[in-house]
């Protein structure tokens, strides 16, 4: 992937996303977010509109009857590196506004286009293989994407099963690219046609994640497909040569933990953009005979990643094993509250690991699916999603909240 393309991806596209208890500022491209106080959100709106510290400070003085000079405002914003960047031109652009004050609407969604898969991985969290009895059609998925885009979703992941197995995949990825800032396709890397690679290269905002779970024999054995490693690595190379960002994901277990450095080297040579390793989770098919990774194996992986970062870090972004859960792939994904997983049958869950639904994407409104009451109930009852139970909401602190409560007074 060329550095020019990386630069294009790094240009911010800022938005303020409102929630019942507050606001977050999001870069809709990187999907990193920063939670704002009500005061911070108001200042962000003002700076984005007039692009001037002096004007913003004076507007604040007149509206709030509170002493505020440009120097005082600059000092206040300089207390944090992110808000300090506001004083240096970060907000010299329109701010997109999305969200709801009544419900928790997502900024990112994963669409399981089908549960069908052409592999039979022993650790598949979705137990993929056969499609569900009543899966959404391509036409219905287009309606879903239009609904999500209309409610401010910026980031979409198309997954499966194997996402490419749905009839109309090319049409769906074009629709997704047209409606959303980022599109991520999760694939096993098999059966990619040249025209599909070309299509994604023209779209310009699509990345592909491909799973590589060891070297030749190990990968093929774990995924139940002879020759799968070679074909998937060739796909990574073709996508990278077409300037499509490729993320390689490796699911670690005892049988492949000693092959991490070799896989990283293969990925660097194939032109991949990012490599990340994740632990096998006790869900789906992996529950049968599941054994958590021993500390010795974890340390082995960490050592290999450090060495690989030293060797290949100038060519490949290698995500730190210790911080994998807070990396770019999950940092913004507060399950249920900022991110939804939509199963192939249309039911919405907080993440791909959880079976309990919040509602149905075509039968229920977005407001009902994201209602605080439903989320609180699922937060208490979730069986597999460990993250949602750890979410602690702050006291409500919304922009213009004081004006609403106090009323407008002269």
From Swiss-Prot:
<feature type="binding site">
    <location>
        <position position="385"/>
    </location>
    <ligand>
        <name>[4Fe-4S] cluster 2</name>
    </ligand>
</feature>
<dbReference type="Pfam" id="PF13186">
    <property type="entry name" value="SPASM"/>
</dbReference>
<dbReference type="GO" id="GO:0016491">
    <property type="term" value="F:oxidoreductase activity"/>
</dbReference>
<dbReference type="InterPro" id="IPR007197">
    <property type="entry name" value="rSAM"/>
</dbReference>
<dbReference type="GO" id="GO:0005737">
    <property type="term" value="C:cytoplasm"/>
</dbReference>
<dbReference type="GO" id="GO:0046872">
    <property type="term" value="F:metal ion binding"/>
</dbReference>
<dbReference type="GO" id="GO:0030152">
    <property type="term" value="P:bacteriocin biosynthetic process"/>
</dbReference>
<comment type="function">
    <text>Catalyzes the formation of the thioether bond required for production of the sporulation killing factor (SKF) from SkfA. Forms the cysteine-methionine thioether bond found in SKF; the acceptor amino acid can be hydrophobic, aromatic or a small hydrophilic amino acid but not a larger hydrophilic amino acid, i.e. Met=Ala, Phe, Leu, Tyr&gt;Asn, Ser&gt;&gt;Gln, Glu, Lys. The relative position of Cys and Met in the substrate cannot be inverted, in vitro the thioether bond cannot be made in the absence of the SkfA propeptide, suggesting this is the first reaction in SKF maturation.</text>
</comment>
<keyword id="KW-0045">Antibiotic biosynthesis</keyword>
<keyword id="KW-0411">Iron-sulfur</keyword>
<dbReference type="InterPro" id="IPR006638">
    <property type="entry name" value="Elp3/MiaA/NifB-like_rSAM"/>
</dbReference>
<dbReference type="InterPro" id="IPR013785">
    <property type="entry name" value="Aldolase_TIM"/>
</dbReference>
<dbReference type="InterPro" id="IPR030915">
    <property type="entry name" value="rSAM_SkfB"/>
</dbReference>
<feature type="binding site">
    <location>
        <position position="117"/>
    </location>
    <ligand>
        <name>[4Fe-4S] cluster 1</name>
    </ligand>
</feature>
<feature type="binding site">
    <location>
        <position position="124"/>
    </location>
    <ligand>
        <name>[4Fe-4S] cluster 1</name>
    </ligand>
</feature>
<keyword id="KW-0949">S-adenosyl-L-methionine</keyword>
<feature type="binding site">
    <location>
        <position position="121"/>
    </location>
    <ligand>
        <name>[4Fe-4S] cluster 1</name>
    </ligand>
</feature>
<dbReference type="InterPro" id="IPR000385">
    <property type="entry name" value="MoaA_NifB_PqqE_Fe-S-bd_CS"/>
</dbReference>
<dbReference type="InterPro" id="IPR023885">
    <property type="entry name" value="4Fe4S-binding_SPASM_dom"/>
</dbReference>
<protein>
    <recommendedName>
        <fullName>Sporulation killing factor maturation protein SkfB</fullName>
        <ecNumber>1.21.98.-</ecNumber>
    </recommendedName>
</protein>
<feature type="domain" description="Radical SAM core">
    <location>
        <begin position="103"/>
        <end position="314"/>
    </location>
</feature>
<comment type="similarity">
    <text>Belongs to the radical SAM superfamily.</text>
</comment>
<feature type="binding site">
    <location>
        <position position="387"/>
    </location>
    <ligand>
        <name>[4Fe-4S] cluster 2</name>
    </ligand>
</feature>
<dbReference type="InterPro" id="IPR050377">
    <property type="entry name" value="Radical_SAM_PqqE_MftC-like"/>
</dbReference>
<dbReference type="GO" id="GO:0051539">
    <property type="term" value="F:4 iron, 4 sulfur cluster binding"/>
</dbReference>
<keyword id="KW-0479">Metal-binding</keyword>
<feature type="binding site">
    <location>
        <position position="380"/>
    </location>
    <ligand>
        <name>[4Fe-4S] cluster 2</name>
    </ligand>
</feature>
<keyword id="KW-0963">Cytoplasm</keyword>
<keyword id="KW-0871">Bacteriocin biosynthesis</keyword>
<dbReference type="Pfam" id="PF04055">
    <property type="entry name" value="Radical_SAM"/>
</dbReference>
<keyword id="KW-0004">4Fe-4S</keyword>
<keyword id="KW-0408">Iron</keyword>
<keyword id="KW-0560">Oxidoreductase</keyword>
């Amino acid at each position: 992937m060329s550095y020019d393309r990386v630069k294009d991806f790094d240009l911010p596209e800022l938005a303020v996303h409102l929630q019942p208890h507050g606001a977050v500022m999001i870069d809709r491209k990187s999907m990193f977010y920063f939670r704002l106080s009500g005061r911070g959100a108001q200042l962000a709106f003002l700076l984005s509109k007039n692009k001037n510290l002096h004007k913003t400070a004076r507007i604040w003085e007149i509206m709030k009857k509170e002493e505020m000079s440009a120097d005082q405002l600059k000092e206040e914003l300089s207390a944090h590196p992110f808000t300090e960047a506001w004083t240096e031109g970060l907000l010299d652009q329109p701010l997109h506004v999305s969200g709801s004050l009544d419900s928790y609407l997502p900024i990112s969604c994963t669409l399981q286009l089908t549960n069908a898969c052409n592999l039979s991985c022993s650790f598949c969290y979705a137990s993929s293989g056969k499609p569900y009895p009543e899966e959404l059609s391509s036409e219905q998925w287009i309606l879903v994407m239009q609904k999500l885009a209309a409610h401010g979703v910026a980031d979409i992941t198309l997954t499966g099963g194997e996402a490419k197995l749905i009839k109309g995949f090319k049409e769906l990825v074009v629709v997704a690219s047209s409606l959303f800032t980022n599109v991520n396709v999760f694939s096993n890397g098999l059966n990619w046609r040249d025209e599909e690679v070309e299509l994604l290269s023209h779209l310009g905002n699509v990345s592909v994640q491909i799973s590589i779970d060891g070297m030749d024999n190990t990968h093929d054995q774990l995924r139940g497909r002879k020759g799968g490693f070679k074909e998937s690595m060739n796909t990574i190379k073709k996508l990278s040569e077409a300037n499509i960002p490729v993320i390689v994901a490796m699911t670690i277990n005892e049988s492949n933990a000693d092959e991490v450095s070799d896989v990283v080297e293969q990925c660097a040579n194939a032109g991949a953009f990012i490599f990340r390793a994740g632990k096998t989770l006790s869900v789906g098919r992996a529950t049968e005979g599941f054994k958590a990774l021993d500390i010795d194996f974890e340390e082995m992986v960490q050592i290999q990643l450090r060495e690989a970062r030293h060797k290949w870090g100038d060519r490949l972004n290698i995500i730190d094993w210790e911080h994998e859960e807070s990396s770019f792939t999950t940092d913004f994904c507060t399950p249920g509250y900022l991110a939804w997983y939509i199963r192939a049958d249309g039911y919405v869950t907080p993440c791909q690991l959880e079976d309990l639904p919040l509602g149905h994407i075509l039968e229920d409104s977005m407001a009902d699916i994201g209602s605080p009451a439903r989320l609180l109930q699922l937060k208490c009852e979730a069986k597999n999603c460990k993250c949602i139970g750890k979410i602690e909401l702050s006291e409500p602190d919304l922009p213009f909240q004081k004006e609403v409560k106090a009323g407008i007074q002269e």
